[in-house]
A protein has these predicted regions:
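Gly/Ala-rich beta-loop-alpha elbow adjacent to hydrolase catalytic centers
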Residues: 2-12
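Surface cap/lid and interfacial helix-loop subdomains adjacent to catalytic sites
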Residues: 18-168, 172, 176
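Short, hydrophobic alpha-helix immediately C-terminal to the catalytic nucleophile
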Residues: 13-17
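Surface-exposed patches in mature extracellular/periplasmic domains of secreted proteins
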Residues: 1-2, 174-179
């Protein structure tokens, strides 16, 4: 599994292209979780976008922003980018909070059912998470982009969803490859 964010996702994309895409090592790739930058399907020739929660050998990516808001440079930085659903891991465009497995908050606790999301072209729109002292998450988003940008939490918002999905993908890969 390759997991990265933002500048790390820039590096992960280069590593995937150079060492995995269409190469023997691709058979060992379970999943690449590469949020925080604009990723295009065309960035890879053989590594495909994963569109169901058990699929392996591909990648997922997303960029998180406050619902009903668009960044100033939306067309350049987000539009046209891959937008995976980091809760259902399929093509559902809207997910209610009851399906959210949990975010990792600053108190090091997991808070399930704390946000709703909607996928648009190049972005995941989210509600402000329902967590204790949510003032801190609102403050952090204001310090970045006037309360709209949740880039700083692309991973934390979906922490438990990513964790559980990676387990599903690992188990499926092991099953198909007959590894105990």
């Amino acid at each position: 599994i390759i997991a990265s964010h933002s500048q790390g996702s820039l590096l992960a994309r280069r590593i995937l292209k150079k060492f995995f895409d269409g190469k023997p090592l691709q058979n060992r790739l379970i999943a690449a979780y590469i949020p925080g930058i604009k990723i295009l399907k065309e960035d890879f020739t053989e590594i495909k976008l994963m569109t169901n929660p058990e699929q392996f050998g591909g990648f997922v990516s997303w960029n998180t922003y406050k619902r009903n808001k668009l960044p100033k440079n939306y067309d350049l930085w987000y539009k046209g980018g891959v937008t995976s659903n980091p809760i259902s891991w399929d093509s559902q465009k809207k997910i209610d909070n009851e399906f959210h497995l949990g975010l990792l908050y600053f108190d090091n606790k997991i808070y399930p059912k704390s946000l709703k999301i909607e996928l648009i072209d190049g972005m995941v729109w989210t509600t402000i998470p329902k967590v204790p002292n949510r003032f801190f998450i609102i403050l952090a988003s204001f310090l970045t982009k006037k309360g709209k940008d949740f880039h700083f939490a692309d991973i934390n918002l979906f922490w438990e969803d990513i964790k559980q999905n990676s387990i599903v993908r690992i188990n499926k890969w092991k099953e198909i490859n007959q590894i105990k």
